Amino acid sequence: MIESNLKKYFQLETLNVSRETFPALEEFRSLLISENKKTNLIGRSTEKDSVNRHIIDSAQIIDIIDNNSKLCIDLGSGAGLPGVVLAIIFKKRGSNIKFDLYEKSLKKSNFLRKIIKHFELNAEVKQKNKLNQQINRERLNKKTYNRLSTNY
């Protein structure tokens, strides 16, 4: 792990993310940057500051996810942001929350499947554009949905 990146991860402690989670997040970030050379997953200009721009930004919503939830849905998951980052964090916490990652792009879906298998995450890729279908609101984490809808 690059020392400068390790220091950046310490910001996650304010979000109650344990230090033991940092290596897995850094490994995901490294795999993301590597795959980004072949498949456009994130903007090239954001690669240099990807710890802040992608990992820490994704982790910032962990407090709005109810720990008792059974399912968390990431619509338009793309590079797995925030879904994969959250799945890694919740796995390290010992949580059983399942993450459904909806992504319409075959290339991005294949990347997500590789990541899920690599980290043995409680997650599944649904390769479809869920935004064009009616969302089954009963399946959504109601606490998260309600907090998001009242904040915007």
Q: Each predicted region: which residue ranges?
A:
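Conserved SAM/SAH cofactor-binding pocket of Class I
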Residues: A59-Y152
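Class I SAM-dependent transferase core
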Residues: I2-S69, K107, F111-L121
